[in-house]
């Protein structure tokens, strides 16, 4: 662990939460998009996070894996996935994207985006971003105090 590892870990959190906020913003912006370039309605996106881990120097053949999780180096975005939950149906036969035949005739498929859920996720991501920012500021303050002690 280096001197700036706390700042490095928190900066990975800042980057991950910024991307999460971008994806949530994209979901909110497309809450009523009934047709995308792919042809169907917009599908909600979500981010999958994974830990950034380095193998520790003490890892050996005699240490069981469950005792050794590695050295944490923050978080990374593993993927951005489309939500497979069912789309919303709204009856609107005058809509240009309404279904023209079958049992769902006159219905329009709308995105599976729940605005309330997105706003809750946005607040959560904002708070996590703020927490990571606080970690960076606290680390900088500790470094300043340590330098002041060393300077006498």
From Swiss-Prot:
Q: Which GO terms describe its biological process?
A: bacterial-type flagellum-dependent swarming motility
Among the entry's GO cellular component annotations, what is one? bacterial-type flagellum basal body, rod
By its UniProt entry, which InterPro entries does this protein fall under? Answer: Flag_bb_rod_N, Flagellar_basal_body_rod_CS, Flg_bb/hook_C_dom, FlgC
Q: Which domain of life is it from?
A: Bacteria
Work out whether the entry's keyword set contains Ion transport: no
PANTHER family to which the protein is assigned, alphabetical: FLAGELLAR BASAL-BODY ROD PROTEIN FLGC, FLAGELLAR PROTEIN
* Assembly mode: The basal body constitutes a major portion of the flagellar organelle and consists of four rings (L,P,S, and M) mounted on a central rod. The rod consists of about 26 subunits of FlgG in the distal portion, and FlgB, FlgC and FlgF are thought to build up the proximal portion of the rod with about 6 subunits each.
State the protein's name. Flagellar basal-body rod protein FlgC
Q: Native species of this protein?
A: Borreliella burgdorferi (strain ATCC 35210 / DSM 4680 / CIP 102532 / B31) (Borrelia burgdorferi)
